[in-house]
UniProtKB/Swiss-Prot annotation:
GO molecular function: chromatin binding; transcription coactivator activity
Species: Danio rerio (Zebrafish)
Subunit structure: Component of the nuclear pore complex (NPC)-associated TREX-2 complex (transcription and export complex 2). Component of the SAGA transcription coactivator-HAT complex. Within the SAGA complex, participates in a subcomplex of SAGA called the DUB module (deubiquitination module).
Keyword terms: Activator, Chromatin regulator, mRNA transport, Nucleus, Protein transport, Transcription, Transcription regulation, Translocation, Transport
Pfam families recorded: EnY2
Homology family: Belongs to the ENY2 family.
Chief localization: nucleus
Protein name as catalogued: Transcription and mRNA export factor ENY2
Its job: Involved in mRNA export coupled transcription activation by association with both the TREX-2 and the SAGA complexes. The transcription regulatory histone acetylation (HAT) complex SAGA is a multiprotein complex that activates transcription by remodeling chromatin and mediating histone acetylation and deubiquitination. Within the SAGA complex, participates in a subcomplex that specifically deubiquitinates histones. The SAGA complex is recruited to specific gene promoters by activators, where it is required for transcription.
Taxonomic lineage of the native organism: Eukaryota, Metazoa, Chordata, Craniata, Vertebrata
Leader sequence residues: none
GO biological process: chromatin organization; poly(A)+ mRNA export from nucleus; positive regulation of DNA-templated transcription; protein transport; regulation of transcription by RNA polymerase II; transcription elongation by RNA polymerase II
Matching PANTHER family: ENHANCER OF YELLOW 2 TRANSCRIPTION FACTOR
Length: 95
């Protein structure tokens, strides 16, 4: 395991242990709904289903077709806020 992987695992573990991961997930969920991202993603899913036909689409197809666009649609402000929260948490709980 690379040093970066070990660090990511340690950070993730600390976020989970302190309950911060769940709080961050809830914040992210709320922000994505607030900015309309969720509605945009629903529309993308409907588009993929319409193009391929409901009988010809698997969940895997949907995920593969929507994930890159979905990630690109997340507003920078939401990404920045989440990153700031993570940094603040780590600064407060660094060992």
């Amino acid at each position: 395991m690379s040093k970066e992987s070990q660090m990511r695992a340690a950070i993730n573990q600390k976020l989970i242990e302190m309950g911060e991961r769940e709080r961050l997930k809830e914040l992210l969920r709320a922000k994505l709904i607030e900015c309309g991202w969720r509605d945009q993603l629903k529309a993308l899913c409907k588009e993929v289903i319409k193009e391929k036909g409901i009988e010809n689409v698997t969940v895997e197809d949907l995920v593969a077709g929507v994930t890159p666009k979905g990630r690109a649609l997340v507003p920078d402000s939401v990404k920045k806020e989440l990153l700031q929260r993570i940094r603040a948490f780590l600064a407060q709980h660094s060992t």
